[in-house]
Amino acid sequence: VHEVSSALLLGHARPFEDEFKPGDRGIALEAALDKAAAEDRVLVLGLHGGRAENGELQAMCELRGIPFTGSGSASSNLAFDKVAAKRFAAIAGVLAPDGIELANLDAAFAEHGRLIAKPARDGSSYGLIFVNAKQDLVAVRNAAKSEEYVIEPFVAGVEATCGVLERSDGEVFSLPPIEIVPGEGAFDYTAKYLLESTQEICPGRFSPEISAALMDHAMRAHRALSCGGYSRTDFIISENGPVYLETNTLPGLTAASLYPKALKAQGIEFADFLRDQIVLAERRVRPSA
């Protein structure tokens, strides 16, 4: 963990292309959290992947009584597991694709023609494998040797995402859905952060019925997973309507990220959003705050 000035952070103009170098050696995470607890800090979480999103960091904060933004440890861990998250979303009435066992990979490819495989516990579309030909099955099997993969039939359609926001006054609502138009291929990590040709249209060009369904399903997923503060759920708009992909309990909040675009479309200033999330974080730990 490093202590970094606002000026240094703001001066890092290309965060997804150039690695940020904080300049000091930093201290261990546990020591930094002990320091935050002693100083009565509130943490605004902006980390991604691994222990930052799987509930481990959140549990470390909870054990120390440190207020933090976003979902708690149990919800974070549940949403980070794509298999479990799909199951809970389906219980809430959200359409989710069927999973495919690795042993049935060849038969599933013969039946569906196209498949998609992704790490069961990761974010930002890391590790996506599109199975469009038989030789792609080898890549899936090799990837599944080192970590668990979710394998599903490929669902054709428009990519969409929809945020949910909880406010300190008790109001909870869905933000305007965003339509994603990848410039080249699929909306993987490169398309999300590096390709200028990718379009993120907010509000999306959806029919009123599809927009309403996206907002309803995002809210259902948020509640089914017991998310806190804010979340963002990704979908594919198939011929049968929105199909659930995953829920992000710590969606990106950079200038290139989707959630701030939805806040802007809703007429919410980003600074006001952060201030309100800090109030919520304090209130969870200190109810009188």
Feature locations, PLM:
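A glycine- and small-aliphatic-rich helix-loop capping segment at beta-alpha/alpha-beta transitions
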Residues: 59-68, 133-138, 266-267
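ATP-dependent carboxylate activation and anion-phosphoryl transfer catalytic cores
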Residues: 207-289
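Phosphate-binding site of ATP-dependent enzymes
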Residues: 132-216, 237, 242-243
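Active-site nucleotide/adenylate-binding loops and adjacent lid/helix of ATP-dependent enzymes
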Residues: 33-38, 76-157, 168-169, 212
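ATP-binding N-terminal substructure of ATP-dependent carboxylate-amine bond-forming enzymes
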Residues: 1-69, 73-74, 78-80, 84, ...
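Short, flexible, mixed-charge acidic loops at enzyme active sites
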Residues: 59-62, 187-194, 249
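Hydrophobic beta-strand scaffold residues
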Residues: 4, 67-68, 96, 115, ...
